[in-house]
Each structure stands twice: as C-alpha cells, then as structure tokens.
Curated annotation (Swiss-Prot):
Binding site for Zn(2+) 2: C149, C151, C154
Similarity comment text for this entry: Belongs to the Gfa family.
Modification sites for Phosphothreonine: T78
Protein name: Centromere protein V
Source organism of this protein record: Mus musculus (Mouse)
InterPro entries, per the entry: CENP-V-like, CENP-V/GFA, Mss4-like_sf
Keywords: Cell cycle, Cell division, Centromere, Chromosome, Cytoplasm, Cytoskeleton, Kinetochore, Metal-binding, Methylation, Mitosis, Nucleus, Phosphoprotein, Zinc
Organism superkingdom: Eukaryota
Positions with biased composition (Pro residues): 54-64
Residues where Omega-N-methylarginine is found: R39
Function: Required for distribution of pericentromeric heterochromatin in interphase nuclei and for centromere formation and organization, chromosome alignment and cytokinesis.
Record-level Gene Ontology MF annotations: carbon-sulfur lyase activity; metal ion binding
Subcellular location, record wording: Chromosome, Centromere, Kinetochore; Nucleus; Cytoplasm, Cytoskeleton, Spindle
Binding site for Zn(2+) 1: C129, C131, C193, C196
Length: 252
C-alpha cells in the first residue's frame, strides 16, 4: 500500500513542476516580445514603425578574406586577350598564326613589326665593355660613319665614334656599373665601366640629345663598312660652325 501511495503522490508533483516550468517559459516569451517592441519603437522616435524590407543585408567577408582580396594581383593579360582588344578584321587568323610560329608574345610581335618598318635600312648592333658588365643595343646603318675627334680628351682615349639618336639606343644591363667623367662645359658625358674602364658609348658634346657609340666595342657580324672622318675638336667652335651635318645627327 505504501508503494501505491508513493506512486500516486509522485504524479501530481511532477505535473506541478512541469506547469511551473511552462509558466516560466511563457513569462520569458512575453518579456522577449516586450523588449523587441521597445527596440523597434526606439529608432522611430515614438512614431509608427513602417514596414521593414524583407531582403537581408549581405554578410561582410571576414577581415582576412578582405585582406586577401586586396592583396590579390589583377589577372595577367594574355596574348589572346590583347589581340581580342584590337580590330584585326580578316587578318586576325594570320596574326595569331604568326605569333605561334615565331613564338612571340603580343608585345614581342608588335616590337618586331615596329622595328622592321620604323628602322627601315638599319640593323640592330649589340655591344658592350670588355668585362661584360655593360651591354647595349643600337639601331644604325650597317655602313658606319665614324668621327675621329682630336680634342684633348678624345685624343688621349682615342674616342672614335658614330652618333645615333637616343631613341635608337638601349642599355641592356650595367647601369650600376657605369661611372661618368665631365670637364669644361660638362656637356659631354664620358661614361666608363667601373670594372674594366672601357668606354663603349658616351654622350657627345656635339649631340647632347644622342649617343656616341664606339664601333670597336660592337659585336662582330653586323658592320658592313666603316668610313672615318677627322673632326678638329681642338678648335671646337670653328669646327662646329664649319661642319654642316654633325649637330643634327642625333635628330630623328
């Protein structure tokens, strides 16, 4: 009999606990709704709250993702993309075939085309100093016109050179290996390799907008002939006045 009473007595107690728990949950729900209404009314200054948009704002990416996106370089422009930007018309297939056959990038193919037609009648010479620290290329005729100057410094260093516009000269390597000597008017820039002392090119006083290239510093195979003209640099002003073409040799 005691066991039966105990079992019967247990039932109502459990129900009371369950009811108490349910009442607490209901109280919490009402409190949450009350707080929600309070927050909704706070931003409206006590007025009626209008309908809220249903679309949710997009979540912002985490800071690490933003940093990675900022640091990521733009996609490289491929030769095909560069070609598609040009209106090649019916020549597109020929152009792409030419690039593949010559194994050239879009820039390389354009450079070859420009060099061929812009420097018609010229050849590309290459050269440099003795130790190889300084290397350059220059577009000039295969038949070189050399000036042999007898001014004080040219006489001592045997400065025989041909003159080209600056746009036809390109230093391939060795900018950090070059040192410069100037004197008098300081217009002539006598550039030498710091290591071996060879002057393979310089900026002449007669043509400060161009370069004087030493023909004996060119690589073999591109020079067809050489004509040497003596220039009386020891009497500079008179020589420059009497010579009709030297001052224009660095012009395009």
């Amino acid at each position: 009999m005691r066991r039966t009473r105990s079992a019967v007595a247990t039932g109502p107690r459990e129900q009371r606990r369950s009811g108490a728990t349910g009442g607490l949950s209901g109280g919490e729900s009402r409190a949450q709704r009350s707080r929600s209404r309070t927050r909704a009314g706070a931003g409206g200054g006590g007025g009626a709250v209008g309908p809220q948009p249903s679309a949710k704002p997009r979540p912002k990416p985490p800071p690490r993702a933003q940093e990675a996106a900022a640091e990521e370089p733009p996609p490289a422009v491929t030769p095909a993309a560069s070609v598609s930007a040009l209106d090649l018309g019916e020549q597109r297939e020929r152009w792409e075939t030419f690039q593949k056959r010559q194994r050239l990038s879009f820039e390389g193919a354009a450079k070859l085309l420009l060099d061929t037609f812009e420097y018609q009648g010229l050849v590309k010479h290459t050269g440099g100093c003795h130790c190889g620290a300084v290397r350059f290329e220059v577009w000039a005729s295969a038949d070189l016109h050399i000036f042999d100057c007898n001014c004080s410094i040219c006489k001592k260093k045997q400065n025989r050179h041909f003159i080209v516009p600056a746009s036809r000269f390109k230093l391939l390597k060795g900018a950090e290996s070059i040192t410069t000597y100037t004197f008098n008017t300081h217009k002539a820039q006598h550039t030498f390799c710091k290591r071996c002392g060879v002057q393979s090119f310089y900026t002449p006083r007669s043509n400060p907008g161009g370069f004087g290239i030493a023909p004996h510093c060119l690589d073999e195979g591109t020079v067809r002939s050489v004509v040497t003209e003596e220039f009386n640099g020891s009497d500079w002003e008179r020589a420059m006045k009497e010579h009709k073409t030297i001052k224009n040799m660095s012009k395009e």
